[in-house]
Amino acid sequence: MRVPDYRPRIAFAIVALLILVSCSNLVSSSESRTTTVWSGNVILPDGYLVDSGEVLSISPGTTVSIGSGHSLDVDGRIIVSGSVSSPVIMNSISGNHEGLVFNYSSDGLGSRVDNLSVVDSKYGVTIYGSDPVISNLTVNNADNVAVDLYGGASPLIVDLVISGGGQDVHGFSTTWRYGIGLSIGAYSTPIVKGAQIDGLITRGVNHWGNSGGLLSDLVISNISGATMAI
């Protein structure tokens, strides 16, 4: 009597099982991404990290208050949806916070910032090798740097306003790197379309470290040090 050969069927079943497990993992990975929505008054004494699997959405008119020396860090994706009449405000609980920070892992995830005002900060927005789209950003009186780009950062920045910076630490700072408006460094290549930079202690635009980019429609005034340094 001839014994049936079940090997092809077993092989097919194993392949089908592997495909099913693979698809199951894909669905699970997609479902693990979470969305957090902020509105009203948000208080962050120790700052906040947007994880790589998280989307943070900030509603118009939201005030985000951050503890001194802390920041809002982005590993994942952030959507700041301020408007002209209801901007999102980022301020400090006490002392100076360290602003909004885009880390390398946020690159390519589609972060957008619109109508954000940053006040009472040491740094306004810092970008490490990421590519957020930022429009209608206002940074008032950042002690060190209003917008700081590192590590091949490639943001699109439209209608930037930087007002004041460095006055509160002038004569006390232990580094020259204070009172700077836009710093483009370490191979960064931003596109900046429209910027008003006024009332800074050290530099309006600081360009260094083999960086490039396209800058247009810049108005720079009342800089105590160098208007531009390249």
Located regions from the model:
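Secretory targeting signatures
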Residues: 1-29
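Beta-strand/loop edge motif enriched in small/polar residues
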Residues: 23-230
